[in-house]
A protein has these predicted regions:
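Short, acidic/turn-prone active-site loops that include or flank metal/cofactor-
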Residues: 1-2, 19-23, 94-95
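A short acidic, glycine/proline-enriched capping/turn motif at secondary-structure boundaries
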Residues: 2-3, 38
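Cap/insert and terminal regions of metallo-dependent hydrolase folds
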Residues: 3-7, 73-126
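A residue-identity detector for tryptophan
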Residues: 8, 20-21, 52-55, 100, ...
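Short acidic capping loops at alpha-helix termini that bridge into adjacent secondary structure
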Residues: 12-14, 28, 87
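Conserved beta-strand segments of alpha/beta enzyme cores
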Residues: 14-16, 30, 121
Length: 126
């Protein structure tokens, strides 16, 4: 993904490629990519060539979780155990379809993921 961002004009000095659970910090704010259940690809030839992720954002005592596109998984409980509880969770919902059970969540799954994370406030997104 880093090469693609650089090709789009993002300065290489601003690009950081991370694996799940690998932390980075910017201006005192910690960013951690966490597990997600999805796939990647922009063209017919690059399927699953980059890692998908959720995001854990920590600023002092404030904790925010951003799910990104994801299906429900045990990863939410793992994230909650490692980084929770969260003040705010931004949870993917609304792109659900019977054909996409593994990569998007039904509303009740989004709520369960929020609870697994130990979330206080939930903002449904897509």
């Amino acid at each position: 993904m880093g090469d693609r961002l650089i090709a789009w004009g993002v300065p290489a000095s601003k690009v950081r490629e991370l694996a799940w659970w690998e932390e980075t910090e910017e201006d005192g704010i910690r960013f951690v990519p966490g597990p997600a259940k999805h796939f990647s690809g922009r063209t017919l030839r690059d399927g699953n060539s980059t890692q998908w992720a959720s995001w854990i954002i920590v600023d002092g005592a404030t904790r925010v979780f951003f799910s990104g596109d994801t299906g429900y998984s045990a990863g939410f409980r793992q994230i909650g155990e490692r980084y929770g509880p969260f003040d705010l969770t931004l949870m993917e919902t609304g792109a659900y379809d019977a054909r996409w059970p593994g990569v998007h969540m039904q509303p009740e799954e989004s709520l369960q993921a929020h609870l697994d994370l130990g979330g206080k406030w939930m903002l449904p997104i897509h």
